[in-house]
Amino acid sequence: MEAAQAGDLTRRQELLAPPCLDTESLRKSRPPALEPGALRCLTPNIRSLWPTCQDSVSTALPFLQEKEKGLPGSPSPATQVLGSCWELMVIGMSDHLSMARNPRGTQCPNLEISSATSPASLQRRPRKQLNPRMGIEKVDPRFKGVTLEFQIQPDSSLQIVPTYSLPGRSCSQKLPASPSKALASPGSSEALGPRRCASCRTQRTPLWRDAEDGTPLCNACGIRYKKYGTRCSSCWLVPRKSIQPKRLCGRCGMSQDPHLSPTQEL
């Protein structure tokens, strides 16, 4: 009976204080140069928890000897103390390892929280409407607004006609054309049809330059006529610079007399 109790006691001692944690065996197994650092922790600034566990083991052994005949299933206070001690050691080691692996996260933990949670004010608003609606047509009697009509005239000019629509009226009120267009002389080229340059017979030009008597000239012919003041008296041909010395028209053979433009007369 006494031999069985002694065997159980030695087993409990081995479980509570295994031989791998014995300081004397560690000192004997390690060389003398490494003896001061045998019981140190991984980090030198952190206090080791092994002395606390060793004290708990020494205090738990007499208690186990007195309570040998206790219930086998009920945990003893010594095992609870050792369990809490081992938990503390494991938690401390995991904290130190995480700090060593990720030092930036431990220095500024608030940055990760702020970056993970974005405020609602920074959310993008959708460009398109959630419920898109079709615009009202001009024929709809509920339409109220201004309609602009763009028309390109034969003289390459742009005419914009605004139309004001009032609600409840099917008819629309149109403004008259521009005063310059309305007051155009009936004998001008606009009344006869599309404008045509009297010199080169073109109908397209970026800018019309009329002569002093209202004869339509294109941009190039108008600049030459304004600069040199020379044209054919019969067919209105404005000669080019290379034909200036000749006094005969290349189209009809008439003489090209210099005609003073209004700027040259001044």
From Swiss-Prot:
GO terms for molecular function: DNA-binding transcription factor activity, RNA polymerase II-specific; sequence-specific DNA binding; zinc ion binding. It is found in: Nucleus. Keywords: Activator, Developmental protein, Differentiation, DNA-binding, Metal-binding, Nucleus, Oogenesis, Repressor, Spermatogenesis, Transcription, Transcription regulation, Zinc, Zinc-finger. A zinc finger (GATA-type) spans 197-221. Its main location: nucleus. InterPro entries: GATA-type_ZnF_Regulator, Znf_GATA, Znf_NHR/GATA. Residues 106-121 have a biased composition (Polar residues). Gene3D superfamilies: Erythroid Transcription Factor GATA-1, subunit A. Induction: Up-regulated in response to bone morphogenetic proteins (BMPs) signaling. Specifically expressed in adult testis and ovary. Expressed at high levels in the somatic cells of the developing gonads, including Leydig cells in the testes and granulosa cells in the ovaries. Disruption phenotype: Mice are viable and normal; however, both males and females are completely infertile. In females, Zglp1 absence leads to a severe block in germ cell development as early as 17.5 dpc. Ovaries at postnatal day (P) 8 and 6 weeks are highly atrophic with no ovarian follicles. Ovaries as early as 17.5 dpc contain a drastically reduced number of cells expressing Ddx4. In males, Zglp1 absence leads to defective sperm development with a marked reduction in mature spermatids observed as early as postnatal week 1. Male germ cells develop normally until P7. GO terms for biological process: negative regulation of transcription by RNA polymerase II; oocyte development; positive regulation of transcription by RNA polymerase II; spermatogenesis. PROSITE patterns: GATA_ZN_FINGER_2 (PS50114). One of its GO terms (cellular component) is nucleus. Residues 1-31, 106-129, 171-191 are annotated as: Disordered. Transcriptional regulator that plays a key role in germ cell development. Determines the oogenic fate by activating key genes for the oogenic program and meiotic prophase entry. Acts downstream of bone morphogenetic protein (BMP) by regulating expression of genes required for the oogenic programs, which are repressed by Polycomb activities in sexually uncommitted germ cells. Regulates expression of STRA8, a central downstream effector for the meiotic program. Acts independently of retinoic acid (RA). This is GATA-type zinc finger protein 1.
